[in-house]
Amino acid sequence: EALGLTLTVFIEVALNKKDKETRDSFMERIRLWPEVLECHFISGEYDNLLRIVLEDIVAYRKFVLDKLLAIPEVEKTRSSISLGQWKSTTALPLGSA
């Protein structure tokens, strides 16, 4: 937040094709975007889950309309705006099983 990046959004992205070429093309593009902190390849109705951090809702709107939806491989998206973070850790649960 000290850098003015106060908005965290999780965006599910469905691609219009499920082949490797489509996935690779999508990944090549989003790897270039500093707003995208994480991208997970997921199961279910959507193919990818992005975690992005932005300044505000105006920057979010611009990101979705000018970048994400401009990718031809993107069929649809669904976003969830984080209202707060309850837990964040990099520690692995070693020995907890």
What are these model-derived regions, one by one?
Residues 1-97:
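A compositional/biophysical signature of low hydrophobicity enriched in polar/charged and small residues
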